[in-house]
Amino acid sequence: MAQFFKAKPNSSKQLSAKQSFSVQQLDHLGAGIAQHQGKVVFIPGALPNETVQAQLTEQKKNYARAKLIKVETPSTERVSPLCPHYHTCGGCDLQHMSLTAQREHKSAALVDIMAKFAGAEGSLAPALSGEGWHYRRRARLATLFDKNTKQLSLGFRASSSSHVVSITECLVLAKPLSDLIAPFAKLLNQLAAKSSLGHLELIAADNGHFAVIRITKSLNDKDMAKLAQFAEQHQIHICLQDNEGEFHGVNGTLLLPVYQLLDDKTDVQPVSLTFTPGNFVQVNAQINKAMVAQALDWLAPQPGERILDLFCGMGNFSLPLARMGADVIGVEGVPEMVSQARENAVANGLSNLTFYHGDLSADLSSEPWMGKIDKLLLDPARAGAYESLQWLKKMKPRQVVYVSCNPASLARDSAVLLERGYKLQKLGLIDMFPQTHHIEAMALFELAK
């Protein structure tokens, strides 16, 4: 029998068709989840209990993705985004959801991920939460020079794109810094070297406001004078970062930003953290203080106890732990941050604190700090602390506090702790980035008796 050609369904038509979807829940990235022809469909911008009109943009074997076109039946938790740049800027992705609902979703997602991938269940601590707007004390804005218009754009990159979205304000950035965006855009466009400028970093510290401008070639005297005048007019410290990574104050002196780590309400002597622009620091001052206070409460450091702080950075947790009287060892993989941490220990008058540089993904058996400890604090990057946890038997801490910026790696590493005889005692959300899907958490593990 002759076999005739049978045309395949036109996939482009399938992808371009607008369809109605009923959204059941959110995934951990904040996208709405619906079902369509036996597949899970992810729809960014959609909320649970909504009926939406969306357009399929990607078809895979077991799932699909769609672009939200219209909300037909809105959720009671849907709110109007406050930011005029929300739908183009890639910075925030949950402004369409009430702040209360955001936090409920994040807490539920955290518990779900821990239960599903680690089989871990512990007492859920109250979420660490604060202001929903103007909470960022630091931001890096991208620049883009248009060779045709000879204009420099200042803003954030669009989601999953290198395109720079020009902005005039940022509602999650500290108000004094947000108010500087438009004036800075005007200033930078007046410079002769505007085609040679990189990013602009804005910092609100406890000792003033700072701006760091990345340059690819030296600025002439007129440009330097304009920057110095702007700095004086707006009461901001401006420094330039050259191709070698060195920083130079526009007025000839370089002042470093300083943050306070302990809440003013504590009875403990203050602890300050001095850092160089470019070093990693937590961007939410209110939540960082609450996070440090909670870590101190959960670990309850005592004089004479040996506490190890892995991935310690410049001492965000190490310094307060030492202030409480414990003998603290901090280990960090970035040499410059170790040097800054040591300087911070001296500046705070702490002699019961030692910092080491080390690769925490390598063999740690011969490290001078490796050995029996009383308690362990982990604050790794998104990749987690899996390799470091392989040395638990040698360290034998009674308690482990794990601070995580990625619930997936936290769940994976929690499974290691459970296998080593630890029990999850407490788990809590850290809402470091309101208006975004990002989930941070703190977990307390104790060695079973």
Curated annotation (Swiss-Prot):
Keyword Membrane among UniProt keywords: no
Q: Which residues are [4Fe-4S] cluster-binding?
A: C83, C89, C92, C170
User: Which InterPro entries does the annotation name?
Assistant: 23S_rRNA_MeTrfase_RlmD (IPR001566), MeTrfase_TrmA_AS (IPR030390), MeTrfase_TrmA_CS (IPR030391), NA-bd_OB-fold (IPR012340), SAM-dependent_MTases_sf (IPR029063), TRAM_dom (IPR002792), U5_MeTrfase_fam (IPR010280)
The Gene Ontology biological process terms listed for this entry are: rRNA base methylation
Catalytic activity, as annotated = uridine(1939) in 23S rRNA + S-adenosyl-L-methionine = 5-methyluridine(1939) in 23S rRNA + S-adenosyl-L-homocysteine + H(+)
**By its UniProt entry, which PROSITE patterns does this protein fall under?**
SAM_MT_RNA_M5U, TRAM, TRMA_1, TRMA_2
Q: Name one GO molecular function term.
A: iron ion binding
Q: What class of enzyme is it?
A: transferase
Question: Residue limits of the TRAM domain?
Answer: 12-70
CDD domains xref list: AdoMet_MTases (cd02440)
Decide whether keyword GTP-binding is in the record. no
UniProt binding sites for S-adenosyl-L-methionine:
Q282, F311, N316, E332, D359, D379
Q: Which HAMAP family match?
A: 23SrRNA_methyltr_RlmD
Provide the function of this protein.
Catalyzes the formation of 5-methyl-uridine at position 1939 (m5U1939) in 23S rRNA.
Report what the protein is called. Answer: 23S rRNA (uracil(1939)-C(5))-methyltransferase RlmD
Protein species of origin: Shewanella oneidensis (strain ATCC 700550 / JCM 31522 / CIP 106686 / LMG 19005 / NCIMB 14063 / MR-1)
Q: What is the lineage of its organism?
A: Bacteria, Pseudomonadati, Pseudomonadota, Gammaproteobacteria, Alteromonadales
Q: Which gene encodes it?
A: rlmD
